[in-house]
Amino acid sequence: MPRRRVIGQRKILPDPKFKSELLAKFVNILMVDGKKSTAEKIVYTALEVMAEKSGKDHLAVFEEALENVRPAVEVKSRRVGGSTYQVPVEVRPVRRNALAMRWVVEAARKRGEKSMAQRLAAEMLDASENKGTSVKKREDVHRMADANKAFAHYRW
């Protein structure tokens, strides 16, 4: 660990089309093998499909979907006296967004629709309506944290 100063978070340039930093981060998470233009095309197509199906604004549906997937608490392993406990800890805001986006992309990749854009749009629409695999993942994480509430005093 550096002793001098804390190194800050790198600033991410906002997305060129919608001027959203959150969307730019999402594109980066979706990107495979450095193919950013392909990832952007997929995200923009998915946003168009979402806006068409829901009748709402592109970014509104996107943000609502992420809001429904963001975890408030998670469990971290902590070793105490030879046994490992799953300790519930609060999730920092930056990590909340990162986890939510990662879960949405993961869930979309496992779906059955034809193109990635369609899969992503379907998963986002499901997430905005509080259903779908990514929301289930968040519920599982919350349930795990709730089940291990007894070990909360081991927080660090």
Swiss-Prot record:
PROSITE patterns: RIBOSOMAL_S7 (PS00052)
Signal sequence interval, chain numbering: none
Entry GO MF terms: rRNA binding; structural constituent of ribosome; tRNA binding
Disulphide bridges, residue numbers: none
Matches recorded under Gene3D superfamilies: Ribosomal protein S7 domain
UniProt keyword list: Ribonucleoprotein, Ribosomal protein, RNA-binding, rRNA-binding, tRNA-binding
Keyword Heme: no
Protein's UniProt keywords contain rRNA-binding: yes
One cellular-component annotation, GO: small ribosomal subunit
InterPro entries: Ribosomal_uS7 (IPR000235), Ribosomal_uS7_bac/org-type (IPR005717), Ribosomal_uS7_CS (IPR020606), Ribosomal_uS7_dom (IPR023798), Ribosomal_uS7_dom_sf (IPR036823)
GO annotation terms (biological process): translation
Subunit structure: Part of the 30S ribosomal subunit. Contacts proteins S9 and S11.
Family classification: Belongs to the universal ribosomal protein uS7 family.
Cited function: One of the primary rRNA binding proteins, it binds directly to 16S rRNA where it nucleates assembly of the head domain of the 30S subunit. Is located at the subunit interface close to the decoding center, probably blocks exit of the E-site tRNA.
Protein name: Small ribosomal subunit protein uS7
Species: Vibrio atlanticus (strain LGP32)
The organism's taxonomic lineage, starting at the top: Bacteria, Pseudomonadati, Pseudomonadota, Gammaproteobacteria, Vibrionales
